[in-house]
Regions:
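Beta-strand-rich interaction surfaces with strong enrichment in secreted/lumenal proteins
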Residues: 18, 60-61, 106-108
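Terminal leader/tail segments of proteins
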Residues: 24, 34, 40, 46-47, ...
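Catalytic strand-loop segment that frames the active site of acyl-thioester-processing enzymes
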Residues: 25-64, 69
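Active-site helix/loop of acyl-thioester processing domains in fatty-acid/polyketide metabolism
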Residues: 33, 64-90
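Hydrophobic beta-sheet segments that form the core/acyl-binding groove
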Residues: 33, 100-139
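Mixed-charge, glycine-accented linear interaction segment located at domain edges/termini
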Residues: 129-156
Protein backbone atom coordinates (compact mmCIF):
# COMPACT_ATOMS: atom_id res chain seq x y z
CA UNK A 1 0.00 0.00 0.00
CA UNK A 2 1.38 3.38 -0.91
CA UNK A 3 -0.18 5.98 1.36
CA UNK A 4 -0.12 9.49 -0.02
CA UNK A 5 -1.41 11.97 2.50
CA UNK A 6 -0.37 15.45 3.41
CA UNK A 7 2.08 15.44 6.28
CA UNK A 8 2.34 18.28 8.76
CA UNK A 9 5.22 16.61 10.55
CA UNK A 10 6.14 13.00 11.01
CA UNK A 11 9.02 13.09 13.44
CA UNK A 12 11.84 10.83 12.36
CA UNK A 13 9.70 8.40 10.34
CA UNK A 14 11.38 7.15 7.19
CA UNK A 15 9.67 7.22 3.81
CA UNK A 16 9.46 3.42 3.96
CA UNK A 17 7.31 3.66 7.10
CA UNK A 18 5.19 6.49 5.69
CA UNK A 19 4.53 4.55 2.48
CA UNK A 20 3.55 1.37 4.34
CA UNK A 21 0.91 2.42 6.87
CA UNK A 22 -1.72 5.18 6.97
CA UNK A 23 -0.75 6.55 10.41
CA UNK A 24 0.57 10.10 10.65
CA UNK A 25 1.71 12.57 13.28
CA UNK A 26 0.86 12.71 16.12
CA UNK A 27 -0.23 9.05 16.06
CA UNK A 28 2.71 7.50 14.21
CA UNK A 29 4.88 5.45 16.58
CA UNK A 30 7.44 3.81 14.25
CA UNK A 31 10.54 5.68 13.07
CA UNK A 32 12.25 3.09 10.90
CA UNK A 33 12.41 -0.55 9.86
CA UNK A 34 15.55 -2.29 11.13
CA UNK A 35 15.00 -5.70 9.51
CA UNK A 36 12.28 -7.36 7.49
CA UNK A 37 11.81 -10.97 6.41
CA UNK A 38 8.82 -12.85 5.04
CA UNK A 39 7.26 -13.41 8.47
CA UNK A 40 9.08 -11.10 10.89
CA UNK A 41 9.86 -7.41 11.26
CA UNK A 42 11.97 -5.39 13.66
CA UNK A 43 11.40 -1.64 13.81
CA UNK A 44 12.55 1.19 16.04
CA UNK A 45 11.09 4.21 17.78
CA UNK A 46 13.16 6.79 19.64
CA UNK A 47 11.12 8.41 22.39
CA UNK A 48 11.66 12.15 22.36
CA UNK A 49 10.94 14.24 25.45
CA UNK A 50 8.60 16.42 23.34
CA UNK A 51 6.16 13.54 22.70
CA UNK A 52 2.59 14.67 23.39
CA UNK A 53 1.85 11.84 25.83
CA UNK A 54 4.75 12.70 28.14
CA UNK A 55 3.11 16.04 28.96
CA UNK A 56 0.36 14.47 31.04
CA UNK A 57 1.44 10.86 31.62
CA UNK A 58 2.86 11.71 34.15
CA UNK A 59 4.28 15.23 34.62
CA UNK A 60 6.41 14.19 37.63
CA UNK A 61 7.59 10.93 36.00
CA UNK A 62 6.93 10.94 32.24
CA UNK A 63 6.41 7.49 30.78
CA UNK A 64 4.91 6.15 27.57
CA UNK A 65 1.44 4.68 28.18
CA UNK A 66 1.40 0.91 27.74
CA UNK A 67 -1.45 1.15 25.26
CA UNK A 68 0.73 3.35 23.01
CA UNK A 69 3.59 0.85 23.22
CA UNK A 70 1.07 -1.74 22.02
CA UNK A 71 0.01 0.61 19.22
CA UNK A 72 3.65 0.88 18.13
CA UNK A 73 3.77 -2.93 17.88
CA UNK A 74 0.49 -2.96 15.92
CA UNK A 75 1.86 -0.37 13.49
CA UNK A 76 5.02 -2.45 13.10
CA UNK A 77 2.89 -5.47 12.17
CA UNK A 78 0.97 -3.28 9.72
CA UNK A 79 4.24 -2.48 7.95
CA UNK A 80 5.01 -6.21 7.73
CA UNK A 81 1.56 -6.82 6.25
CA UNK A 82 2.02 -4.06 3.70
CA UNK A 83 5.53 -5.09 2.65
CA UNK A 84 5.38 -8.89 2.75
CA UNK A 85 2.03 -10.49 3.56
CA UNK A 86 -0.72 -8.99 1.44
CA UNK A 87 -1.47 -8.89 -2.24
CA UNK A 88 -1.67 -5.17 -2.95
CA UNK A 89 -4.33 -5.52 -5.65
CA UNK A 90 -6.64 -7.50 -3.36
CA UNK A 91 -6.58 -4.88 -0.59
CA UNK A 92 -6.99 -1.70 -2.62
CA UNK A 93 -9.11 0.68 -0.53
CA UNK A 94 -8.61 -1.30 2.68
CA UNK A 95 -6.62 -0.49 5.81
CA UNK A 96 -5.28 -2.69 8.62
CA UNK A 97 -7.12 -2.33 11.94
CA UNK A 98 -6.80 -4.07 15.28
CA UNK A 99 -9.55 -6.66 15.69
CA UNK A 100 -8.42 -8.68 18.70
CA UNK A 101 -5.93 -8.79 21.55
CA UNK A 102 -5.46 -12.32 22.85
CA UNK A 103 -3.00 -11.49 25.60
CA UNK A 104 -0.83 -8.61 26.72
CA UNK A 105 1.85 -8.52 29.39
CA UNK A 106 3.38 -5.27 30.62
CA UNK A 107 6.75 -5.85 32.28
CA UNK A 108 8.69 -2.58 32.20
CA UNK A 109 8.21 1.10 31.42
CA UNK A 110 9.46 3.35 28.62
CA UNK A 111 10.79 6.85 29.33
CA UNK A 112 11.93 9.89 27.33
CA UNK A 113 15.20 9.09 25.60
CA UNK A 114 14.56 5.35 25.38
CA UNK A 115 14.83 3.53 22.07
CA UNK A 116 12.07 0.98 21.57
CA UNK A 117 12.86 -2.10 19.52
CA UNK A 118 9.54 -3.27 18.11
CA UNK A 119 9.13 -6.82 16.84
CA UNK A 120 6.19 -8.53 15.18
CA UNK A 121 6.05 -12.12 13.95
CA UNK A 122 3.33 -13.38 11.64
CA UNK A 123 1.64 -16.55 12.91
CA UNK A 124 -1.25 -17.31 10.53
CA UNK A 125 -3.90 -15.88 8.23
CA UNK A 126 -7.62 -16.67 8.35
CA UNK A 127 -9.54 -14.92 5.55
CA UNK A 128 -8.72 -11.20 5.92
CA UNK A 129 -7.36 -11.60 9.47
CA UNK A 130 -3.66 -11.79 10.30
CA UNK A 131 -2.48 -13.25 13.62
CA UNK A 132 0.71 -11.90 15.21
CA UNK A 133 2.94 -12.11 18.25
CA UNK A 134 4.82 -8.96 19.17
CA UNK A 135 7.21 -7.46 21.67
CA UNK A 136 8.61 -4.08 22.56
CA UNK A 137 12.09 -4.09 24.07
CA UNK A 138 14.68 -1.63 25.26
CA UNK A 139 18.27 -2.77 25.64
CA UNK A 140 17.11 -6.40 25.16
CA UNK A 141 14.68 -6.18 28.09
CA UNK A 142 11.05 -6.92 27.24
CA UNK A 143 8.66 -4.08 28.05
CA UNK A 144 5.53 -5.55 26.48
CA UNK A 145 4.64 -8.89 24.92
CA UNK A 146 1.34 -9.25 23.09
CA UNK A 147 -0.64 -11.56 20.81
CA UNK A 148 -3.10 -9.85 18.49
CA UNK A 149 -5.02 -9.91 15.22
CA UNK A 150 -5.14 -7.27 12.49
CA UNK A 151 -7.90 -7.32 9.91
CA UNK A 152 -8.17 -5.59 6.56
CA UNK A 153 -11.30 -3.42 6.46
CA UNK A 154 -12.83 -1.17 3.84
CA UNK A 155 -11.46 2.35 4.32
CA UNK A 156 -14.72 3.87 3.07
CA UNK A 157 -16.47 2.71 6.23
CA UNK A 158 -14.04 4.51 8.52
Amino acid sequence: MLYKRSMVENGNATQEVLNSIPHRFPFLFVDRVVSLTEGRIVAERILRKEEFFFQGHYPQMPLMPGVLICEAIFQTAGILMSKKLINQASVEGKVPVLTRINSAKFKRMAFPGDTLNLEASFEQKVKDFYFFKGTAKKQDQILVSIEFVLGMVDAKGL
